[in-house]
Amino acid sequence: MIAGEANDGAALSRFVDGLDVVICAYLGDNDFMINAQKALIDACDRAHVARYIASDYCLDYTQLNLGDYPAKDPMKIIHSYLQETKHVKGVHILIGAFMETFWSSHSQVWHADSNSLKYWGTGEEPWESTTYGDAARFTAAIALDSSAVGMQKFLGDRKNIFQIAQAMNKTYGVQPKLQCQGSLEDLRRVMHEIFAKDPSNIYAWLALFYQYYCINGQAEISNDLDNQKYPDIKPQTFEDSLGTHDLQSLSSSMNNLLNN
């Protein structure tokens, strides 16, 4: 165990000394995600660590421009930063949206109090998603595979909101209500209006940007997956994941996971 702050250069150097690969799982605001990762990457580069697994675990942000989805700007900046290192090579794991996050209040899709799925668009837009557990398993496999560098794309399932509702009905015997809130263009307009009022109020706009870029097709990962590289990992589908939770605890599955 190496104790120290994320900006403690001496502690970072002790931490990475002698390592072949470093897995970053930082989570914080944009300044932290950029500067703390840069400090860790610099320590890895000085120590000639072979690979650095960036704290990504999301949709394909490489298809976005800076500023499109502000919460993903740090990923783009770190991706570029790793192109300039002398020794350490970057690894970027993309998994779509976490399934547990999809069900949480953070996403604003599943509303347990009204037994409803609220969506934007036609409803035919697919959600690409992977569980936290499967993302961790793929990350461990990547860490053990010295040939794995660059972008690595994995997916548990790909379903639209109607198919997800069918999966819920099949699992729980309950048909959720489906409520369309507007077109994708409506969503884009609303999210930018809210963002423009107060960009610092991240919780006012984050879920809307999250929904938009998860389903508008711009940042999809399913066209070039790496699942087949690790055939021993059988990722859960939406149905599989639903089967591990009862309906009442579904919306808290992310918090329960993170607290355990």
Task: Describe the function of each predicted region.
Residues 17-53, 70-81:
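NAD(P)-cofactor binding segment of oxidoreductase domains
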